[in-house]
Amino acid sequence: MSGKNIPVGPIVLLGAPGAGKGTQAKLIAGHYGIPHISTGDILRDNVARGTDLGRKAKRVMERGDLVSNDLVNGMVADRIKQPDCDRGFVLDGFPRTVAQAEWLDRELAAKAGEKKPTVVVDVKVSYNQLLQRLTGRRTCPVDGKIYNIYLQPPKTEGVCDVCGTQLFQRVDDTEEVISERLKSYERQTKPLEEFYKKQERLRCVNGDQPVEKVTADIFRAIEGGAAAAGSE
């Protein structure tokens, strides 16, 4: 059943690398008829369109530096002011810090009639499952097809089903690198989770389940959060 008549409001989606956040964000957007706003996408879009913020971000990236909070916040602010965000939107990859979360609350409060994010969904996946998903990735250098030796292996070990080329593991998919990324995410996100917990906005979903079950649990969390916000 479509949820396009449900006024869900702003949704924040949290989840570690490998949690399937991007997949779930697209499913949420399609089900409720709201835009999926990924900070990576809007950054690339601003750079491609040559906006003022995009030009500034491009100069920063060309120096090899990280794009500042102010630039990212500005791009998010411009995007959520668009008419297609009036019924709600799902933010993927933002906020990453408490400072960004506080900024988002202020930005939404300034938007006519808006409150804090209706619900913050945290897709929780066990450490071992994340390691399997990320370290098991193998890529075809010819067509870019991605396999997973644990979850979606090629028909013949080590070679692409389509062209027969030897698959390779990216340097940043090794266990050492992945383990550090996950620890870094945990350190960064813990304060953010506590921030939203205190607001009673955080809804945790078990991401170890099959995709369809995770999606169903997310929809329930969103609609429960929307109902609670509507009664405030």
Model-derived features with residue positions:
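Glycine-rich phosphate-binding loop of ATP-dependent small-molecule kinases
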Residues: 1-232
